[in-house]
Amino acid sequence: MSEELLKVLKAAGLDVLSCMHCGTCTGSCPSGRHTGLNTRRIIRDARKNRATVLSDDALWLCTTCYTCQERCPRGIPITDALLELRRLAVRKGFMRPEHRRVSELVLECGHAVPLDEETKKKREELGLDPIPETVQKYPEALEELKALLKTCKFDELAAEK
């Protein structure tokens, strides 16, 4: 196992050797019933240091409901480990296109859903302020958010690699 991957998993409290591959996590997973998410396989791939574990789209299918973690007979924090693997994946440049697009929107306008003229008009018709109480309404707050995102290097993480 690569030193970096092992460090990430240890930080999540995941003792990869304690997993007995019983399948309780996968069998309990609500998302796994409808998608390609197989938590047991992801843990196994991480344990075997398979290069594909970070680029696997299934890593992003977890909804973080924590069912797998609650039911694991060994008490392995599986969801936390998946989140750590996601963080490492992003640092290594593996980000789903739709996540990258949302990141770009947040960097650009401070919100994942930009406010267009049609939405402003509909809000006015409903008797609402055309611009809701978000950073989009306050230019100085938007600039502060952009500065904060730059300081924490979010722009670099979101950039295409």
UniProtKB/Swiss-Prot annotation:
Gene3D superfamilies, A to Z: Alpha-helical ferredoxin
The protein's required cofactors: [4Fe-4S] cluster
Residue intervals of the 4Fe-4S ferredoxin-type domain: 10-40, 51-82
Main localization of the protein described in the UniProt heading: cytoplasm
Pathway annotation: Cofactor metabolism; coenzyme M-coenzyme B heterodisulfide reduction; coenzyme B and coenzyme M from coenzyme M-coenzyme B heterodisulfide: step 1/1
Keywords assigned: 4Fe-4S, Cytoplasm, Iron, Iron-sulfur, Metal-binding, Methanogenesis, Oxidoreductase, Repeat
Highest taxon in the source lineage: Archaea
Enzyme Commission code(s) on record: 1.8.7.3
Gene Ontology molecular functions: 4 iron, 4 sulfur cluster binding; CoB--CoM heterodisulfide reductase activity; metal ion binding
Residues reported to bind [4Fe-4S] cluster 1: 19, 22, 25, 72
Assembly with partners or alone: The ferredoxin:CoB-CoM heterodisulfide reductase is composed of three subunits; HdrA, HdrB and HdrC.
Name this protein carries in UniProt: Ferredoxin:CoB-CoM heterodisulfide reductase subunit C
Organism of provenance: Methanosarcina mazei (strain ATCC BAA-159 / DSM 3647 / Goe1 / Go1 / JCM 11833 / OCM 88)
